[in-house]
Structure formats: C-alpha cells, structure tokens
A protein has these predicted regions:
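Membrane-embedded beta-strand positions of outer-membrane beta-barrel proteins
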Residues: 16, 32, 67, 79, ...
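Residues that define the transmembrane beta-barrel architecture of outer-membrane proteins
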Residues: 8-14, 57-63, 93-97, 104-106, ...
Length: 150
C-alpha cells in the first residue's frame, strides 16, 4: 500500500551478519553470528508533546547461535537461537528458536523444522517476532536446496 510510505526508499530494509563458524568434529559444527538490521521507516506514534516518535528503533542488533550434528552421512539435527540485543520503546521482539532435521541425497538437501518465527526475511524475524516459544507458539518450516557437484 503506497499510502504507508512517503518515499519509495521508506520500503527498504537491510540485514548484515558476520558468520563465525567452526567444524568441531566431523559430525558437530557450531556457529555464532552477530547481526545488524536496519529499516528506513518504522511505525510511529504521537507522544504527549505532540511529536511523532518511532515505536521501535530503525536499527536492531541481535546475536545468533547455531549448531548441526550429523547423525549419519545423510541426516543431521539442526538448531538455531537468535537473541535480540536492542531494546525498543514498545513491542520488543521475542527470541527466535528453531530445531529440525536435515536429510541429504546426492542432489538435494531437505530441511524440516519447527520454529517460532514467521518470515523468510531475517530482519523481520529479528525485529518483529512476537511468537513466544515458551508458550508453544511454533510454526513448521521446510527448505529444499539443490546440491551442485561440478
């Protein structure tokens, strides 16, 4: 809806992440990933002085922890946890958590997992997730990746 944005650039958001990972053993890998999300426009409200303020900051910082344990050559258990670090005026996001299995064939990798976040875009998950995993608010996800062996 064009009425929500003054400029086209107000629609833009950005996500940056530094991925630090380590293959601990042949079967076990871990990852730590600090991230920064930026939204050019955030929802606002009018304060008691009549000024418009953002409900949330335009910038949001988070840190993610992930792990993968290979049960066999074709199957692995995967887990991920994203902890928001930025505190906003209202609507602070809930942490993202997911766990699942990965099955590989010679040409594809299939992942099926349960997580409490809803979007395919990571900056939306990190900044706006209101699903609380402690209350069982999980969704089911599925990924398929084509493996290329050149």
């Amino acid at each position: 809806d064009g009425e929500n944005f003054v400029n086209n650039t107000d629609r833009f958001s950005y996500f940056n992440q530094l991925i630090i990972s380590r293959k601990v053993t042949d079967a076990f890998s871990v990852q730590v990933s600090p991230s920064w999300s930026h939204f050019n426009a955030v929802e606002g409200y009018v304060n008691e002085d009549g000024d418009i303020e953002g409900k949330m900051n335009n910038d949001h910082f988070a840190i993610a922890f992930g792990g993968r344990y290979k049960v066999s050559n074709q199957m692995a258990i995967i887990v991920n946890y994203d902890q928001p670090l930025t505190k906003h005026t209202t609507n602070n996001p809930e942490p993202n958590i997911s766990f699942g299995i990965e099955v590989s064939t010679s040409a594809h990798a299939f992942q099926i997992f349960a997580g409490n976040y809803y979007s395919i875009i990571p900056q939306l998950n990190n900044m706006y997730n209101q699903n609380d995993y402690r209350e069982g608010q999980f969704l089911i996800g599925f990924n398929i990746t084509r493996l290329w062996n050149f």
